[in-house]
């Protein structure tokens, strides 16, 4: 059941916020909801670290896409609905979404969550909005590149933001480039990452 556990009241505020940031557990009417490797279709360990794709199965999941067999076959491969959301599963069964599969950055064989980098950058006082996408790289295949909208009258620099990220992120997750610009958005304010990828 997705409900607050009284034992969590004893944790400090940071730990409680970390718990609240998780997305929850399997919906009772679902036959199955788990995290799997989309290639092997094997379940991921419940360690809160290993990233896999959220897979769903049950009579509340769609049967397929209207008149699109190819898309249906891809989405339902292996008898599970492939959500496109990448997540980890914790020992208590709670899931935390890390990224969309199309937004993950694969650098030197390592999967990097763009959301993790964006969350780090957003903690800097000069950053209003951050968006991170994969930039092609000859050596690593892809590397993180950050696009930043700054807070008005609070200037910063590429060097400062990279140093800021190095304080909390593993070296391979630190953006290799920071670009300051107005971010392209939809009418509802969602950042259009596909437009940012076109810049490379």
Q: Model segments located where?
A:
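Conserved AMP-binding/adenylate-forming
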Residues: 1-94, 101-104, 117-118, 153
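Short alpha-helical interface patches
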Residues: 9-20, 142, 163, 197-199
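Short loop/turn motifs at secondary-structure junctions and domain boundaries
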Residues: 24-27, 77-79, 139, 174-176, ...
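AMP-binding/adenylate-forming catalytic core of the ANL superfamily
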Residues: 58, 63-64, 74, 86-173, ...
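General small-molecule cofactor/ligand-binding pocket signal
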Residues: 178-181
